[in-house]
């Protein structure tokens, strides 16, 4: 088994409003190994999205530690956290968050340009990735001209363009019909197998979650069960 890519220990998150405290995460411990496909399932309000924000250094835990590639995220400066987000962690959301006035190509190239890659190289890499996700014929189209499934494919391409070690996906198929959701799942697994990128997927879809390597069930701010998919099932699908 590969070395842990991400390790969380004792993650707590408490929101305070006046004298009232709300504990959203209650001591979460888990790890993701390189190249794993992991699902987090649970009802709304169980703490899934809050945890994802902490793992992506978009929010800070009240207590506990997050180590990503041996860096303790909460001890890094804001600039170093931003660099890790740009270069080593990709993000996909239920709502694609594509820039409406930019083409698919421009949206995918944006993280590269922000990271200092020149326009020619950024366009080349973005084009290659859009071809990989089956959108070579749509690279000049804006988000409003794409279907829901196509927009999510663009969002996944954007998340992967910097060749991150980890992609955090928050309900990436939540707005899609079942067939399109299955297509997106198959795309994530294909890209995982090709690039070795690990995926952590928050989802309400138990059927899709069961297809990933590991499923973590969250309830009331804690993980209550962990299910590891059998190696035989993984081999049969590969």
Curated annotation (Swiss-Prot):
Enzyme type, top EC level: translocase
Cellular component annotations (GO), alphabetically ordered: plasma membrane
InterPro entries recorded: AAA+_ATPase, ABC_transporter-like_ATP-bd, ABC_transporter-like_CS, LolD_lipo_ATP-bd, MacB-like_ATP-bd, P-loop_NTPase
UniProt key word RNA-binding: no
Chain sites annotated for binding ATP: 42-49
Domain ABC transporter: 6-238
Gene3D superfamilies (UniProt xref): P-loop containing nucleotide triphosphate hydrolases
Pfam hit, one: ABC_tran
Molecular-function GO term, any one: ATP hydrolysis activity
Assembly information from the UniProt record: The complex is composed of two ATP-binding proteins (LolD) and two transmembrane proteins (LolC and LolE).
Protein name per the record: Lipoprotein-releasing system ATP-binding protein LolD
